[in-house]
Regions:
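A membrane-periplasm/extracellular boundary helix in multi-pass inner-membrane enzymes
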Residues: 136-137, 157-199, 219-221
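Transmembrane alpha-helices of multi-pass inner-membrane enzymes
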Residues: 108-109, 300-344
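Alpha-helical transmembrane segments of multi-pass inner-membrane proteins
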Residues: 55-81, 94-156
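Hydrophobic transmembrane alpha-helices and their immediate junctions
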Residues: 119, 163-164, 266-308
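Aromatic-anchored transmembrane helix interface
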Residues: 1-12, 20-45, 60
Length: 344
């Protein structure tokens, strides 16, 4: 966490040095990210002092996640009559772009509890999460990452049983349904553009390719940019129109849709090394929790986040996801420390 905070500070100075962007403008778009990362130390301390009960937080996430999905689902169905959730909506489809951590985490928590306790009521949370993916979020990559995270959790069940086989079959059926849906058609169109360039005009895949080529070009300008990145650009600063937010047709490139590529553009190879080390530690802790305490959700969740990295770094761009990563780290450290205390 400390390394991520240091990276953010370096990026503020770096962008000022390279294009003259004021330090305050480099800090402004990262303020939520930085403050939430700093909160890790306070939250971790409060958990250690028993001021925060981790199980109460989990139950709160389950409740708030279900409530969020219900509210968003109602908005999707009533979008032609009233708008009470003020978020960006896709023009062509009824897709809401929301800060979705609570909507997604309930599926992993619910499936984990089901695998641990064999209580079917927890599958309700998985179903609710899939409602979010299919009706509200409609993100192909996010859906694929969640399903693969679930699949790994199921395959790691320590008891090979009829129940396990049935759940795997359900997963296969879900994949078949997905392949025959409109979602897959749009996914296939994106692949055609990426690999065969068979569609016309500018779409998101084409914009991403332009962005990534431009990011690489700028990183290679000097050893300093390669190591420390190009800094965090504020879209409100005019100088970024020729660096991070270049126009492509009627659109322009940006950071949000370029995942780990944008992260490396901002923080350089130093940032890439920090993320690699961070995710290694996350995997190591999640695997220990699974092996020692039979807790599945951290591993499935980290796998899902890893798959998303190609296009999406929610934990960097969205406050609830940044907090979610802080919670994940605090949760795993607390559970593993409890195990060490029991051994003593």
């Amino acid at each position: 966490v400390s390394a991520l905070i240091v990276l953010a500070i370096i990026s503020i100075v770096q962008c000022n040095f390279l294009i003259g962007q004021p330090l305050s403008m480099g800090f402004a778009p990262q303020r939520n990210y930085i403050f939430i990362l700093v909160s890790y130390f306070t939250i971790r301390k409060l958990i250690a002092l028993d001021k925060i009960d981790i199980n109460t937080v989990v139950n709160g996430l389950l409740f708030c996640g279900v409530l969020s999905v219900i509210i968003y689902w109602l908005q999707v169905n009533l979008i032609d009559y009233v708008q009470f959730v003020h978020v960006y909506k896709a023009a062509r489809v009824t897709r809401l772009y929301v800060d979705s951590f609570m909507c997604v985490i309930i599926g992993f928590l619910g499936l984990s509890k089901y695998l641990e306790e064999n209580n079917k009521k927890y599958l309700f949370f998985v179903a609710i999460e899939l409602v979010y993916e299919l009706i509200i979020g409609q993100s192909r990559l996010e859906l694929a990452s969640v399903v693969l995270g679930y699949a790994v959790m199921i395959l790691l069940m320590k008891r090979l049983s009829f129940r396990k086989i049935c759940m795997i079959l359900i997963g296969v059926i879900a994949v078949v349904v997905f392949i025959n849906s409109a979602f897959f058609e749009r996914f296939n169109e994106a692949l055609q553009m990426q690999f065969y360039n068979t569609t016309t005009g500018i779409d998101t895949m084409a914009i991403r390719k332009v962005a990534r080529d431009e990011f690489v070009r700028q990183l290679k300008q000097s050893p300093a940019t390669l190591i420390f990145g190009c800094g965090y650009p504020n879209i409100g600063y005019s100088g970024t129109a020729s660096t991070a937010y270049i126009a492509v047709g009627n659109e322009r490139i940006g950071l949000v849709d370029n995942g780990i590529f944008a992260f490396v553009y901002v923080y350089g190879l130093l940032g890439a090394s920090v993320v690699i080390k961070w995710f290694y530690k996350l995997y190591k802790s999640a695997w220990k929790l699974y092996k020692i305490k039979n807790i599945y959700w951290p591993l499935g969740f980290v796998i899902s986040l890893t798959i998303l990295l190609y296009n999406i770094t929610f934990w960097w761009n969205k406050p609830s996801w940044t907090w979610g990563m802080v919670f994940l780290m605090c949760y795993m450290e607390h559970k593993l420390n409890d195990e060490l205390d029991e051994e003593k």
